């Protein structure tokens, strides 16, 4: 089969690789550079999504935990285990028993992964590990394990595997129009026909359909997630619960520095993505609420934002499902949603869908 994959983020790269491993002829089109947008602007975590358990997404969490282990086995130089602490305060957003139950369920779903199990740390033990953490009303913290990664380099590793499998990669080649009936894919320089077209363009997937006159049964919410990098080396991560919200913020090791993120803000234009002043203030305020050492804008080493394309939800952004949707229209397969961690599993599902 001759296959065109549109989108050079991690989901596109893994989809192209999956098709090529089955002997298909594959062209991968990317309007810019591989891994240059959403896929390199993540929170740098390979994770099951602990907070998704609150919304009942057990299948997604179980799959993500399995895929987390796959990435580490394949590229241990670019990904590895990381312990994170969730401080528990008296009268906090989530009761100690609730967080503990979530950690135990998370460990159960990760059975066989080889990761250590979560545990409770007393307030004194937390102070040893995070001496800068404020201890007023602190009961202790639950520790649990996930994985950190270098998203950009790990994505390039996957892209190289894709090339080695025989995929032809066309960077800086925007696709202008597609035709689900004929399989035509048109760029500025040419037009070719394919047996299958896979639209896995992430935040730009709907735009491609619109310019091609193709309708879909699904709609995407584009959600901007912003991060800042500040000085300070950490050995462990920390998960902060945001007062008055059900959201969490990560405080993570980032080389010799510390990464804070992420926000969730509606984004209209995928081409104009940058942290807003309000988001930066939000991240700084929530960090300063929990740590003794106050940071200001002058401390920021860098800031970045990415757009998560989430299948539209009737509830709030935090409750929106990160489950992906695969839609078949003739020779066209649209891929909406998805997570970095589960990109390989999503790619396998796309290949299966293409065969029916």
Residues covered by each model-derived region:
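A conserved short coil-to-beta-strand element within the FAD-binding core of flavoproteins
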Residues: 171-184
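Flavin (FAD/FMN) cofactor-binding and adjacent substrate-gating region
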Residues: 88-165, 177-180, 255, 293-296, ...
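Dinucleotide-binding Rossmann-like beta1-alpha1 core, especially the glycine-rich loop
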Residues: 44-129, 249
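Flavin (primarily FAD) binding-site architecture
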Residues: 199-214
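C-terminal catalytic lobe of FAD-dependent flavoproteins
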Residues: 217-229, 233-234, 241-259, 266-356
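Glycine-rich FAD pyrophosphate-binding loop
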Residues: 20-41
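Short hydrophobic core segments
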Residues: 6, 193-202
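N-terminal Rossmann-like FAD-binding beta1-loop-alpha1 element of flavoenzymes
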Residues: 3-27
């Amino acid at each position: 089969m001759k296959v065109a994959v549109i989108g050079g983020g991690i989901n596109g790269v893994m989809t192209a690789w999956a098709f090529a491993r089955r002997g298909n002829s594959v062209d991968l089109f990317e309007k810019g550079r591989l891994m240059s947008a959403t896929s390199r602007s993540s929170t740098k975590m390979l994770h099951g999504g602990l907070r998704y358990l609150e919304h009942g997404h057990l299948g997604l969490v179980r799959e993500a935990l399995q895929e987390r282990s796959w990435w580490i086995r394949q590229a241990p130089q670019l990904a590895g285990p990381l312990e994170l602490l969730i401080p528990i305060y008296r009268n906090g957003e989530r009761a100690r028993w609730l967080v503990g139950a979530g950690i135990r369920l998370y460990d159960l779903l990760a059975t066989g992964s080889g990761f250590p199990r979560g545990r409770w740390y007393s307030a004194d033990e937390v102070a040893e590990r995070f001496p800068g953490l404020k201890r007023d009303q602190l009961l202790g913290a639950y520790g649990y394990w996930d994985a950190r990664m270098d998203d950009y380099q790990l994505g390039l590793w996957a892209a190289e595997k894709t090339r080695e499998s025989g995929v032809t990669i066309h960077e800086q080649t925007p696709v202008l129009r597609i035709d689900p009936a004929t399989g035509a894919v048109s760029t500025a320089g040419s037009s070719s026909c394919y047996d299958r077209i896979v639209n896995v363009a992430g935040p730009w997937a709907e735009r491609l359909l619109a310019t091609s006159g193709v309708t879909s049964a699904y709609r995407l919410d584009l959600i901007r997630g912003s991060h800042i990098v500040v000085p300070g080396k950490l050995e462990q991560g920390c998960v902060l619960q945001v007062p008055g919200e059900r959201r969490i913020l990560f405080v993570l090791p980032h080389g010799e520095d510390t990464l804070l993120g992420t926000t969730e803000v509606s984004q209209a234009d995928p081409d104009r993505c940058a942290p807003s002043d309000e988001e930066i203030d939000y991240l700084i305020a929530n960090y300063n609420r929990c740590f003794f050492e106050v940071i200001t804008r002058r401390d920021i080493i860098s800031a970045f934002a990415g757009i998560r394309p989430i299948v539209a939800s009737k509830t709030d952004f935090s409750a929106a499902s990160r489950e992906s949707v695969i839609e078949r229209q003739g020779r066209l397969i649209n891929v909406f949603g998805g997570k970095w961690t589960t990109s390989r599993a999503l790619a396998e599902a796309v290949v299966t869908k293409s065969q029916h």
